[in-house]
Design a protein with these regions (language model features):
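Serine-esterase "nucleophile elbow" of acetyl-processing enzymes
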Residues: 23-75, 90-102, 120-126
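N-terminal secretory signal peptides that target proteins for export/translocation
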Residues: 1-4
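Residues at alpha-helix caps and immediate loop-helix transition turns in enzyme cores, especially N-
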Residues: 51, 84-85, 239
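Alpha-helical cap/lid subdomain in secreted, periplasmic
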Residues: 31, 88-235, 241, 245-264
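Structural motif
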Residues: 79-88
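Histidine-bearing beta->alpha loop at or near hydrolase active sites
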Residues: 77, 236
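Flexible loop/turn segments at secondary-structure boundaries
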Residues: 20-23, 174-175
Length: 265
């Protein structure tokens, strides 16, 4: 065999490992990034309306940003159902890596009828039952699941990718009765806790933690500083900061939750 022919035979053997190595730096860069906390939820977590702020924005300042990234992927008007059906969760999953974290808080937009024009209600509870409904927004048939099913789906998907899932009960509204904040302990707060337990996820009872904090502060201050004059659901910056602090309080109280190790002292 001539030297020229021998060189042609060896060329593919040389090129294949070289081209494979060329792709490694991009993959390595992706794998070597800081652990990331992804936050998903509704407008009480992230809000673009003037004067309204969700807790998912100020909470980033409570983490050591030299050790973790905090990305708020919550979106106003979304429910546990529509965060999945609109493809928002799929985008989070595409970026999620082993060692990352997901905090989720849904519930405020999950009520109503399944064929409501906004197409966002889930079945009440945590069961596995389904119901066929026509999505009034898209005009398409849709299999609707329970609130708890959607939370378990998010937690299960996150865990399958090696990430840690934390489920929060929804923040309380500025609604009081006989000097006490109205809780969600008989519906979405309860169901969030049950879903976390069955999914093997961590649970922060944010509804209860914040309600107690509001009661300590007092109804007048809560109304004057933490909410808008005509809105009992969405918080001001001060309210969002207080709620973010309550999320951190809940994280610190969890046993063996690795996310707490990334908080500022």
């Amino acid at each position: 065999m001539s030297i020229s022919i021998l060189r042609l035979c060896l060329l593919p053997m040389i090129l294949i490992p070289t081209s494979a190595l060329a792709a490694e730096p991009a993959d390595a860069k992706r794998l070597d990034r800081l652990p990331t906390l992804f936050i998903i939820g509704d407008s009480t977590v992230r809000n673009s309306t003037k004067g309204q702020v969700g807790w998912g924005d100020p909470i980033g300042d409570l983490f050591d940003k030299s050790t973790i990234r905090v990305i708020n992927r919550a979106l106003g008007g979304r429910s546990s159902r529509t965060y999945l059906t609109e493809g928002l969760w799929e985008k989070v999953l595409a970026d999620l890596q082993a060692g990352d974290f997901v905090i989720m808080q849904f519930g405020h937009n999950d009520g109503g009828g399944l064929s409501d024009p906004r197409g966002r209600a889930s079945i009440k509870g945590t069961g596995d039952e389904t119901q066929e409904a026509t999505n009034a927004r898209t005009g398409e048939k849709e299999t609707v699941h329970s609130y708890g099913w959607y939370l378990r789906r998010y937690a299960g998907d996150a865990k399958a990718k090696g990430a840690t899932a934390i489920i929060c009960s929804p923040i309380p509204r500025n609604i009081w009765k006989e000097g006490k904040v109205a809780r969600a302990s008989n519906d979405y707060g309860k169901w969030a806790g049950e879903s976390a337990k069955s999914a093997g996820a961590f649970f922060v009872d944010l509804n209860e933690i914040i309600a107690k904090r509001y009661e300590d502060v007092g109804q007048k201050k809560v109304a004057d500083e933490y909410f808008g004059a005509t809105d009992h659901t969405h918080t001001t910056l001060a309210g969002a900061q207080l709620n973010a602090g309550c999320v951190v309080e809940g994280l610190r109280g969890l046993k063996d939750c690795p996310l707490a190790g990334y908080l500022k002292p």
